[in-house]
Amino acid sequence: MLNKMKPGGVVKIFLFLLLFVPSLLAQEYKVIHIKGDVKFRSNTSETWTELKGGQVLNLDEFISTGVKASVQIENLGNIIIIEELSAVSIASIKKMSTDELLLALAMEDMINVPKSDGKGKGNSGSTAVYGEKEGTEINTELNSDDFGIKRLNGAIQLAKNDLMGSSIIFAKETYRKYPNTKQIASYRIFFADVLYEKGLYEEALGEYIETQKLELSEEQRTNLNNRINDIDKLLLNH
């Protein structure tokens, strides 16, 4: 898919990887407090292991919190709190500039180009089904295999820790790996709102328009229409 991008876009992404990844590798993620059931695993393992206080986590690891559980992780002098029923990758716990976010969004768009199955249809991957969720509070009635929803909860935790860019990208990755989580309007609205708050109005507008196609409550539909009208006015004045 790189051959479909303009050369300048490829260069920008290469420079992003060259400059950003080494600084990320130099960071340390240390567990400083654990409450309740918190586990971790690497990307290459299906086995979850109990997390210990004082443990230093690797970039390729995930953490997952149980009901009424939480974990505090120290990184570069900052404390990141991940609350209950959430899952995040350690690599996603990072600050992103607006330029880094835009490049990461471009990379996600490239990855998300549907693969043809030879019959003119894209392959959607996962067939897991998730129900609608009201609001953006943590759902405490998850099944043990609802890892896609736990990841979206984790993305919300990133946003609550002021890691807005990482929150958006982690949510996008989750939608790609667990496609049916995209049908849950409350999450889509939450992350579109994050884009709006970041001042990325065109990107937010695209998300709001896509979310309009989902099953919405009257309140959600009204709020979406109002936000779309607000963005239209903002873009018209620029």
Predicted regions and their residues:
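TPR-adjacent "capping" and linker segments in tetratricopeptide-repeat scaffold/adaptor proteins
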Residues: 131-151, 176-180
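Short solvent-exposed coil/turn linkers within tandem alpha-helical repeat scaffolds
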Residues: 177-182, 211-223
